[in-house]
UniProtKB/Swiss-Prot annotation:
GO annotation, cellular component aspect: cytoplasm; nucleus; proteasome complex
Keyword Cell cycle: no
Domain PCI intervals: 232-403
SUPFAM superfamilies, alphabetized: Winged helix' DNA-binding domain
Name of the protein this chain belongs to: 26S proteasome non-ATPase regulatory subunit 12 homolog A
Similarity field: Belongs to the proteasome subunit p55 family.
Phenotype reported upon loss of the gene: Displays a host of morphogenetic defects, including abnormal embryogenesis, partially deetiolated development in the dark, a severely dwarfed phenotype when grown in the light, and infertility.
Encoding gene (name): RPN5A
Primary location recorded for the protein, binned into one broad class: cytoplasm
Protein source organism: Arabidopsis thaliana (Mouse-ear cress)
Subunit structure comment from the entry: Component of the 19S regulatory particle (RP/PA700) lid subcomplex of the 26S proteasome. The 26S proteasome is composed of a core protease (CP), known as the 20S proteasome, capped at one or both ends by the 19S regulatory particle (RP/PA700). The RP/PA700 complex is composed of at least 17 different subunits in two subcomplexes, the base and the lid, which form the portions proximal and distal to the 20S proteolytic core, respectively.
Function statement: Acts as a regulatory subunit of the 26 proteasome which is involved in the ATP-dependent degradation of ubiquitinated proteins. Required for gametogenesis and sporophyte development. Acts redundantly with RPN5B.
Cell compartment(s), UniProt: Cytoplasm; Nucleus
Length: 442
């Protein structure tokens, strides 16, 4: 009881001192008295009293902002030294209540929320952790370091992906502009002028900008994998591949380059896929994995690919991806790979044939006539090519896709011919009318 009474007496003395300093608007004195009270409670390991004093001091009339900020910052150092989870959660909630609605401790509130969300996640409460994180809009915090903002938003995205909330994950990911990762960190930062908002330095546990870039694209790969957006997955792996630390070590870039090759083949044929495919083929590192270089060359070359021989050759490599960086290529990857080979073969046939029987087309594609017609129809609907099927005669007619300028020029030319014809007809009619009128005169 003696120690307890001594502690209370010391706290009462410091509270009186704090009151005098606060009323005199002495920032340094108020801050010192408030932090000493918290330190006494911590040294005594009286966590209940610590929470009470934090709330009590923060609610004092005319309490100085600097004193509240110092109290919150000091109490945050005690969080990791709490004896159990319940005490830790109680202290974090107390500090959250104190910092609620106060712009001068918004960064501390964000860090506290992150700590609480981590505890909830460890307890298996993913949804609660995600909801907690989403309450904080760090993108509006002007004084928070850029890397800390990005790390916080990425944590929000990760928790949304963990709870299968892909819509919200996409919304949150759009708060990060990928160009921010390409900023030149080597440039000397300008010293802030007097009166400018000071940006706090990021804590030591926050990753660097390049590390955050990798985390960002790994999360985007998880998001795009949900809808099997192969071209976007490929672009994300390409961004990871371009990180200097990845390119320096073959153990890291070889698995990433393998993934780029696979997803390029899995992606539907379009201008972006074609551009990435040609750019990847020019990469010198591709010679280190010759099988994949040959695979890309097969896809680029306008020749019919035999599915069975291709699958037999690359089946083991396909299965090997499960044990490499990024994991398997997806549940539907095997089916989609076969579909892409069929689409490639149809494009090859359309290049060399103007007219072909459906039976011969099915033979070239190693499919039944019904399957060949189905895949051809799907490609026509997706506007990958232009074709017409004459079902009674069983003939497919391919047409060359015209550029929009060509179509416009053709239409303008036909319209000009039509107007010329109309004008000529008018002249002829007028001529005939004049001739007949002249003949009727006496």
């Amino acid at each position: 009881m003696g120690d307890s009474g001594k502690l209370e007496a010391t706290i009462d003395r410091l509270l009186n001192e704090e009151k005098q300093m606060r009323l005199a608007e002495n920032v340094a004195g108020t801050r010192k008295a408030a932090t000493e009270i918290l330190q006494l409670c911590f040294d005594a390991k009286d966590w209940k009293l610590l929470n009470e004093q934090i709330l009590n001091l923060s609610k004092k009339r005319g309490q100085l902002k600097q004193a509240v900020q110092s109290m919150v910052q000091q109490a945050m150092q005690y969080i990791d030294q709490t004896p159990d989870i319940e005490t830790r959660i109680e202290l974090i909630k107390t500090l959250n209540n104190v910092s609620a609605g106060k712009i001068y401790v918004e960064i501390e509130r964000a860090r506290l929320t992150k700590k609480l969300a981590k505890i909830k996640e460890e307890q298996g409460q993913i949804a609660e952790a995600a909801d907690l994180m989403q309450e904080v809009a760090v993108e509006t915090f002007g004084a928070m370091a850029k890397t800390e903002k990005i790390a916080f938003i990425l944590e929000q995205v990760r928790l949304c992906l963990d709870r299968q909330d892909f819509v919200r994950a996409q919304i949150l990911s759009r708060k990060i502009n990928p160009r921010v990762f390409d900023a030149d960190t080597k440039k000397d930062k300008k010293k802030p002028k007097e009166g400018d908002n000071m940006v706090e330095e990021a804590p030591a546990d926050i990753p660097t900008l390049l590390e955050l870039k990798r985390i960002y694209y790994e999360l985007m790969i998880r998001y795009y994998s949900h809808n099997n957006e192969y071209i976007e997955i490929c672009r994300s792996y390409k961004a990871i591949y371009d990180i200097p630390s990845v390119k320096e070590t073959p153990e890291q870039w070889i698995p990433v380059l393998r993934k780029i090759c696979w997803f390029l083949v899995l992606a539907p044929h379009d201008p972006m896929q074609s551009s990435l495919l040609n750019a990847t083929l020019e990469d010198k590192n591709l010679s280190e994995i010759p099988d994949f270089k040959m695979l890309l060359k097969q896809v680029v070359t306008m020749e019919v690919i035999q599915w069975t021989s291709l699958w037999n050759k690359y089946k083991d490599e396909f299965e090997k991806e499960k044990s490499m960086i990024g994991g398997s290529l997806g549940d539907k990857a095997g089916e989609d790979l076969k579909l892409r080979i069929i689409e490639h073969n149809i494009l090859v046939v359309s290049k060399y044939y103007a007219r072909i029987t459906l039976k011969r087309l099915a033979e070239l594609l190693c499919l039944s006539m019904e399957e060949a017609e189905k895949h051809l129809s799907e490609m026509v609907v997706s506007k990958a090519l232009i074709a017409k099927i004459d079902r009674p005669s069983g003939i497919v007619c391919f047409q060359i896709a015209k550029d929009s300028n060509e179509i416009l020029n053709s239409w303008a030319g036909n319209l000009e011919k039509l107007l010329d014809l109309v004008e000529k007809s008018c002249h002829q009619i007028h001529k005939e009318t004049m001739v007949h009128k002249a003949a009727l005169r006496p």
